[in-house]
């Protein structure tokens, strides 16, 4: 991390901080009794850890995104973030990346999941209102 510019370090730490705050806040709302959530977390961990490497060192193809999307649509953004965090922590243990890389990855996934949850809730709320108007 020493070789990074001050601006890059600020961006990384900002993303980690915002992601950590959102993760803590969202996971307080998690339904821990949902067994399907643990199955998805295990599938996500396997998919995240065993990604397909591309033609060069900087390219890989992760099928974990399908698991994250399914968790988001099926169980909501809080559950999707749980699956992302578990998947990335397992990958971190397996591949032993530097701490700031995986922390940044978790934060960089957490922020858009939170924002997508806000959009999804707004769109869903609007469609329920339209549905209610149509039934009158």
For the regions a protein language model found, what residue spans apply to each?
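Short helix-perturbing small/polar motifs within transmembrane alpha-helices
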Residues: 1-60, 64-136
